[in-house]
Amino acid sequence: KDLNLQISVKLADMLTLFGYKTEQIRTEDKSVYTQGENVRQRKVSDMKNRLSVFNSNPENVVISIHQNKFTESKYSGTQVFYSPNNPQSADLAESIRQSVKTMLQPDNERECKKADKSIYLLKNATVPAVICECGFISNESECAKLQDDTYQQKMAYAIAVGLMNVY
């Protein structure tokens, strides 16, 4: 979650410099739940609050930054998931994928994937929305890159270029 926040702050700062209006759901390491007596209830509240922000303005475009993890360490590379509810989501996902591939990961052959019902935020977003899994923290080499400030800047820039190519 620290990596997600570091990259998302860099992305928001960059997009602001390029003239985009940005809004981050969180700028520090804390959830955005408003209710719940246990972890599950707080997680549900957190997701509903995020979705409410996403869908609050039809002009919003959502890029949610995440990291991937798998039981085997051989997997690497950015992967982008997109909401099935807005056709612009697929275009945004593909543009980000191409940008990251061109600038950072020329050997990355991962394709964009339409989110299934298990990805609550994308399943319920009405605005263009993507989740960008920047890399695999279960891959030692990639995890080291993701922790590097310069690499984070490059990742944020590649994602920003992907957005700017569509919007």
Regions found by a protein language model. Give the residues of each.
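Active-site-proximal helix/loop segments of hydrolytic enzymes
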Residues: 2-167
